[in-house]
Amino acid sequence: MAIVKCKPTSPGRRHVVKVVNSDLHKGKPYAPLLEKKSKSGGRNNNGRITVRHIGGGNKQHYRLIDFKRTKDGIPAKVERLEYDPNRSANIALVLYADGERRYIIAPKGVSAGDMIQSGEDAAIKVGNTLPMRNIPVGSTVHCVELKPGKGAQLARSAGAYAQIIARTGTYVTLRLRSGEMRKVLSECRATLGEVGNSEHMLRELGKAGASRWRGIRPTVRGVVMNPVDHPHGGGEGRTSGGRHPVSPWGVPTKGYKTRSNKRTDKYIVRSRNKK
């Protein structure tokens, strides 16, 4: 995998930094694992914008990813690595010994031809999926379940991982990239290793059009809007907004706590905001 900085042959190329991976499949994706992906333009069933900054972009198919890894005891061969427009991580097409193919999140260090497996008795090896009670303390994992059998929810994006730092009774304690330490049932599954494509964070789109290809519309500052559109809007000439920064709906936007899920607070051993 290489980082390529484009030559300034035009204003649109001047700032482009690409992540080039020669190991990715050049052809079409595996059709039986594709689904239609409709665009909403950020609008709801009334036609009103409910999510800003969404619209346009290239057509995409959704790739059906196996986040549960429930084919226990059946070895699988990694056929190829592929680009997935729906996520920052790359994906791997794996062929199981019984003939079934599935997509999984591609772990770092896994390449075409490697063998992987899932289940209680799977080896402690990058790409294998096991219940966390069978994974040694200190191991790095990704694609972590929060509820047994629900499928992976934590550490799924490019370069992400969690570390198992303790095992107490029916729970393991994970340290996440954010600094949060969290208890998760030891019956939950996780995949060994970390997610690949960690260079994703180094890319530079280089021009506005590259964001538009991805379906991302411009973000306009509140201070340049009218009072009807934003709490910071209006005023004669250029203003500073006249109040502490808030969202378009008046919610403080710098350092204001918005977490309201008290039900799961008991599982958080250490907050990501604690220094």
From Swiss-Prot:
Disordered, as annotated region: 28-48, 223-275
Annotated TM spans: none
GO cellular component, one term: large ribosomal subunit
Domain of life: Bacteria
InterPro entries registered for this protein in UniProt: NA-bd_OB-fold, Rib_uL2_dom2, Ribosomal_uL2, Ribosomal_uL2_bac/org-type, Ribosomal_uL2_C, Ribosomal_uL2_CS, Ribosomal_uL2_dom3, Ribosomal_uL2_RNA-bd_dom
GO biological process, one term: cytoplasmic translation
Positions in coiled-coil regions: none
Molecular function, one GO term: structural constituent of ribosome
SMART domains xref list: Ribosomal_L2 (SM01383), Ribosomal_L2_C (SM01382)
Protein family membership: Belongs to the universal ribosomal protein uL2 family.
Protein name: Large ribosomal subunit protein uL2
Protein source organism: Photobacterium profundum (strain SS9)
Species classification: Bacteria, Pseudomonadati, Pseudomonadota, Gammaproteobacteria, Vibrionales
